[in-house]
């Protein structure tokens, strides 16, 4: 009876990603159908995690030659240091290495200094190279040393000042989140003849360091991980079937090999690499365990769930005394039933 609390709730069967004008930055993600009220619950939770908890990169401090503090001005530069610092906050960075790291800008006037003038290093990419940092007049000569780091959320400038900071180092407010905007809408949707379900539509804009659909996937994974501690019981459902005629204590379908399920090459290879041979091996895996399998993503998970559902099975089931000692002999004995 316990499993009915979650097993009998409708689950979304469609996840559609509609790319925006810039697919790497903007997209609409639609999930349906959801139980009534779950659109609001999931939409709000995902939005908060998307904006606050995903890892990103930002400039955390700057040191400009011949500048002692942020209320100074630089000869030949139209903007004062306060404006330069403000503009540096708007530089979008993608880091695939652990920080902090040092980058620099060296420029001479006349001209415009943009984010594209920042020196890049291995594992660090400037995403908005056209972003303006300052304007230089004739004869101006500017050198800046930037510190970049990874983190999440918002970190105030005073937290970015090292204890041994040299004179002239100016800490900067760091906005690490790669997600810039998130909005969601919940509308009614139909499932069969029933219209009393939710459709969740999320519109997501990132800085380009993370695609919108990946951002949603990471946010969902964070929620999944945070909620797991509240589950204080083992799955009670069992795939056992006492069949006197067959002489088995479980459903013979569990003896079918997964390579007979007509899965995509990617899904089949992931199962093979994880040493999952029989359906009995597969159904005892939870969704979380499957998603931890290398190269195994949400698309493969949905494919496998759909195939198992058609057989009256699902992930996370319990099979007593599995695998049987004579599993290969049993598989040959019942292969005609498959």
UniProtKB/Swiss-Prot annotation:
Alphabetical list of NCBIfam families matching this protein: PRK05182.1-2 (NF003513), PRK05182.2-5 (NF003519), rpoA (TIGR02027)
Task performed by this protein: DNA-dependent RNA polymerase catalyzes the transcription of DNA into RNA using the four ribonucleoside triphosphates as substrates.
Spans annotated as Alpha C-terminal domain (alpha-CTD): 250-338
Region (Alpha N-terminal domain (alpha-NTD)): 1-234
Keyword Magnesium included in the entry's annotation: no
The protein's name: DNA-directed RNA polymerase subunit alpha
UniProt keyword Protein biosynthesis, yes or no: no
Keywords tagged on the record: DNA-directed RNA polymerase, Nucleotidyltransferase, Transcription, Transferase
Stated family: Belongs to the RNA polymerase alpha chain family.
Record-linked HAMAP family: RNApol_bact_RpoA (MF_00059)
Domain remarks: The N-terminal domain is essential for RNAP assembly and basal transcription, whereas the C-terminal domain is involved in interaction with transcriptional regulators and with upstream promoter elements.
Biological process according to GO: DNA-templated transcription
Subunit structure: Homodimer. The RNAP catalytic core consists of 2 alpha, 1 beta, 1 beta' and 1 omega subunit. When a sigma factor is associated with the core the holoenzyme is formed, which can initiate transcription.
MF terms (GO), sorted A to Z: DNA binding; DNA-directed RNA polymerase activity; protein dimerization activity
Assigned GO CC terms: cytoplasm; DNA-directed RNA polymerase complex
InterPro entries: DNA-dir_RNA_pol_insert, DNA-dir_RNA_pol_RpoA/D/Rpb3, DNA-dir_RpoA, RBP11-like, RNAP_asu_C, RNApol_insert_sf
Gene label: rpoA
One Pfam family linked to the record: RNA_pol_A_CTD
EC number: 2.7.7.6
Catalytic activity: RNA(n) + a ribonucleoside 5'-triphosphate = RNA(n+1) + diphosphate
């Amino acid at each position: 009876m316990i499993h009915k609390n979650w097993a009998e709730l409708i689950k979304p069967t469609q996840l559609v990603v509609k790319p925006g004008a810039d697919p790497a930055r903007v997209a609409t993600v639609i999930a349906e159908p959801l139980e009534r009220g779950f659109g609001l619950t999931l939409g709000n939770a995902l939005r908060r995690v998307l904006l606050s908890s995903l890892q990103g990169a930002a400039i955390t401090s700057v040191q400009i030659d011949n500048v002692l503090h942020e209320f100074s001005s630089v000869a030949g530069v139209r903007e004062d240091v306060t404006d330069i610092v403000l503009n540096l906050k708007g530089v979008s960075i993608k880091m695939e290495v652990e920080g902090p790291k040092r980058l620099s800008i060296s420029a001479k006037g006349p001209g415009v200094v943009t984010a594209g003038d920042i020196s890049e290093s291995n594992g660090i990419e400037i995403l908005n190279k056209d972003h303006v940092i300052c304007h230089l007049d004739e004869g101006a000569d500017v050198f800046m040393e930037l510190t970049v780091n990874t983190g999440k959320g918002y970190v105030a400038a005073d937290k970015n000042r090292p204890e041994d900071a040299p004179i002239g180092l100016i800490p900067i407010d760091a906005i690490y989140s790669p997600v810039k905007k998130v909005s969601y809408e919940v509308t009614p949707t139909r499932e069969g003849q029933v219209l009393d379900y939710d459709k969740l539509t999320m519109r997501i804009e990132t800085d380009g360091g993370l695609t919108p659909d990946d951002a949603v996937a990471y946010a969902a994974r964070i929620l999944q991980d945070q909620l797991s501690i509240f589950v204080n019981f083992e799955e009670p459902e069992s795939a056992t079937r006492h069949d006197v005629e067959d002489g088995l204590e479980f459903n013979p379908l569990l003896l079918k090999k997964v390579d007979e399920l007509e899965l995509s090459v990617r899904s089949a290879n992931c199962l093979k690499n994880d040493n999952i041979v029989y359906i009995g091996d597969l159904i005892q895996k939870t969704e979380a365990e499957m998603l931890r399998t290398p190269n195994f993503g949400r698309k493969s998970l949905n494919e496998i769930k759909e195939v198992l559902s058609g057989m009256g099975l699902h992930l996370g089931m319990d099979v007593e005394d599995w695998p049987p000692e004579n599993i290969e002999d049993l598989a040959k004995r019942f292969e005609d039933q498959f």
